[in-house]
Amino acid sequence: MTTDTIVAQATALGRGGVGIIRVSGPLAAHVAQTVTGRTLRPRYAEYLPFTDEDGQQLDQGIALFFPNPHSFTGEDVLELQGHGGPVVMDMLIRRILQIKGVRPARPGEFSERAFLNDKMDLTQAEAIADLIDASSEQAAKSALQSLQGEFSKRIHTLVESLIHLRIYVEAAIDFPEEEIDFLADGKVSADLQTIIDNLAAVRREANQGAIMREGMKVVIAGRPNAGKSSLLNALSGKESAIVTDIAGTTRDVLREHIHIDGMPLHIIDTAGLRDASDAVEKIGIERAWEEIRQADRVLFMVDGTTTEATDPQDIWPDFVDKLPENIGITVIRNKADQTGEPLGICHVNQPTLIRLSAKTGQGVDALRQHLKECMGFSGNQEGGFMARRRHLDALERAAEHLAIGQQQLEGYMAGEILAEELRIAQQHLNEITGEFSSDDLLGRIFSSFCIGK
């Protein structure tokens, strides 16, 4: 438990009808007595004057006192709800800081104390920041699911399954004299496969949750005059890029942040790829390749009037060979209004082919639907949770160790190695909820929060 008391403004900085100051720590009741002149009843809203050290009134408003452990942080908490002007808020905070033993809160310190006092786990604490920063209704719903413990429940279920399997495996190791070979009886193999399958399902949902939080990066790439800028405008619904018949009009990277049924996408238009002699155009092409290498998916724009080919290897093998491994690619045959080709998704094998007209907008809805399906997302889904990059990394490492354990079990009946791999996998899963986390990791997470959270 901490011994110091912290204070910060819990509402956003700036002018507002109401401003809230939050105090947490062992001196919260003393602060309430000092500022209001009253001993506050627990969990009662009382309308009182807030005074300075000379008894002069600074403001008046509602005071709320929450004794530990029944508070957000698990400590004694005081909230003063006054008028939301920055001057009034500043005067009240300076008044509270005059009380010995009270200091300003660090960013995220209230949530950090809630975590340290077991009021929430790490995924729930992170969900507070994600809910505040949500850029769409769907993102807010997903963050709320995480805050309510949906992600944590999935992780705890996996951990409990691992614990039970570890007990069984380690018992088989500790009692080798038993006539029954526990490792070979099929139960261990079946239980391990079930855990691997359940982890894979959580990873799929977590990947989707990470996209909901961070957005999917989609890069439009191709030769000059293929219609890349027209497609950016069609997807964004506005004239973001200049469109002309002159090859090489786009010389720099253009970005638009859009939502498709609540799914955030970062759409990036790039310079036409070719052997350029112009120095400025060369820089634009270099930047285009930088964006391509970092993309979640590349939309390979093809001028449908210049070729009938649909396989990217036939259209431009040098371009395909330069793409990073495992990057998603969708072939877009543009200018269907001129070629008369059937619109929409033509085949869903790798890579998917879509025929459209960026100029008229025909077929663009099929592309929007395709982008959602690429990430396994449906705007009508409920119950999804928010995830962060560190969660994905921990889930991936856990899956890797389970796979190693499975190989050792099936190939060598190596119970000791399996037990160790199960232990490491459990440790990685515990990192997600904070049951096993370094102080450095906690510091990085909570330092990104708002001051009063």
UniProtKB/Swiss-Prot annotation:
PROSITE patterns: G_TRME. Keywords: Cytoplasm, GTP-binding, Hydrolase, Magnesium, Metal-binding, Nucleotide-binding, Potassium, tRNA processing. (6S)-5-formyl-5,6,7,8-tetrahydrofolate binds at R22, E79, K119, K453. It is found in: Cytoplasm. Pfam families: MMR_HSR1, MnmE_helical, TrmE_N. Exhibits a very high intrinsic GTPase hydrolysis rate. Involved in the addition of a carboxymethylaminomethyl (cmnm) group at the wobble position (U34) of certain tRNAs, forming tRNA-cmnm(5)s(2)U34. This is tRNA modification GTPase MnmE. It comes from Vibrio cholerae serotype O1 (strain ATCC 39541 / Classical Ogawa 395 / O395).
